[in-house]
Amino acid sequence: MTFLFQLALAALVILSFAMIVGVPVAYASPQNWDSSKRLIFLGSGVWIGLVLVVAALNFLVV
């Protein structure tokens, strides 16, 4: 269970760093907004899901 928690936490951190860089770049380029909008919403949904998974696993591990 601890390994799964660490894996989910690492995925959350990596996705957070990717979105910190990617979202401002996507907002700064108006010509690709249609394709970027879908990617931003997908990344946001995955991020929220990972936060909930990490919270649940943290409850089970500790």
UniProtKB/Swiss-Prot annotation:
It is found in: Cellular thylakoid membrane. It holds the Pfam family Ycf9. One of its GO terms (biological process) is photosystem II stabilization. Keywords: Membrane, Photosynthesis, Photosystem II, Reaction center, Thylakoid, Transmembrane, Transmembrane helix. GO terms for cellular component: photosystem II reaction center; plasma membrane-derived thylakoid membrane. InterPro entries: PSII_PsbZ (IPR002644), PSII_PsbZ_sf (IPR036512). SUPFAM superfamilies: PsbZ-like. The chain crosses the membrane at residues 8-28, 41-61. It is a multi-pass membrane protein. PSII is composed of 1 copy each of membrane proteins PsbA, PsbB, PsbC, PsbD, PsbE, PsbF, PsbH, PsbI, PsbJ, PsbK, PsbL, PsbM, PsbT, PsbX, PsbY, PsbZ, Psb30/Ycf12, peripheral proteins PsbO, CyanoQ (PsbQ), PsbU, PsbV and a large number of cofactors. It forms dimeric complexes. May control the interaction of photosystem II (PSII) cores with the light-harvesting antenna, regulates electron flow through the 2 photosystem reaction centers. PSII is a light-driven water plastoquinone oxidoreductase, using light energy to abstract electrons from H(2)O, generating a proton gradient subsequently used for ATP formation. Belongs to the PsbZ family. This is Photosystem II reaction center protein Z.
